[in-house]
Structure formats: C-alpha cells, structure tokens
Amino acid sequence: MSLHGILASAGTIGAVAAWLMSYKPALFGFLFLLLLLSNWLVKYEHKLTLPEPQQDEILQRLLFSEMKMKVLENQMFIIWNKMNHHGRSSRHRNFPMKKHRMRRHESICPTLSDCTSSSPS
C-alpha cells in the first residue's frame, strides 16, 4: 500500500493530505497562503504591542500576582496538612478509646452471661 492509500484511508484529513500531495501546485499554493497569513499575523501583532514602560508595568503586576498566588497556595497546603494531621491524631485518640470500651463491654458480658446461664434448678 502506498503513502497516498494510507493517508486516504486515515479519514478526511488524510484524504485532504493525499490530495494535496498528488497536486503539488495546490500544495505549494496552500503553503504560500499559510506563509502570507503568518507574515500578516506577525505584522499585526507588532502593531498591537505596547510601549516598553507599559509592558514593564504589566509584567511587574503579573509577577506580583503570581507571587501572591504562590503564598496563598503555600498557606492552603499548610492548612491542608494541619487538617490531615489533626484528623489522623484524633482518629488515633478515638481508636484506643473504642478498644477500651470494647474491653469494658467484654468484661461486663461474661458476668451477665454467667448470671443468666446459671439459673436455679
């Protein structure tokens, strides 16, 4: 199977690519249009650029905002870690108390079962 067959079987984009490859003048024209479009976009972007002092001021504001975001992110991580650590420590405190309660119930249950099982005959 040739490259054209593989591209044509790949779908719509593959069929268009195969057609462009078979028609070299059309491919050349398409690439030339892309080149003109990119040149126009670069010229248009150059007209939209701000003067140097305004760009510097905007850059400083962006950097300052990014620094504030980093500080807030670090504070959130600190709070998150404290909450997780507090949750783990409270779970560890409650867990032995549950065991202690179970032991207390176990110690009561045998005496109750002894009392109920020993019925007068």
UniProtKB/Swiss-Prot annotation:
- Entries under Pfam families matching the protein: DUF5531
- Listed GO cellular component terms? membrane
Record membrane topology: Single-pass membrane protein
Q: In which tissues is it expressed?
A: Testis-specific.
Transmembrane intervals: 18-36
- Note whether Signal occurs among the keywords: yes
- List, in alphabetical order, the GO biological process terms annotated in this UniProt record: single fertilization
Between which residues do disulfide bridges form?
Answer: none
UniProt signal peptide: 1-17
**Where is this protein localized, as stated in its record?**
Membrane
Can you tell which superkingdom this protein's organism belongs to? Eukaryota
Keyword set for this entry? Fertilization, Membrane, Signal, Transmembrane, Transmembrane helix
Chief place of localization = membrane
Against PANTHER family, the record matches this protein to:
TESTIS-EXPRESSED PROTEIN 46
Q: What does this protein do?
A: Essential for male fertility, sperm head formation and sperm penetration through the egg zona pellucida.
The protein here is known as Testis-expressed protein 46
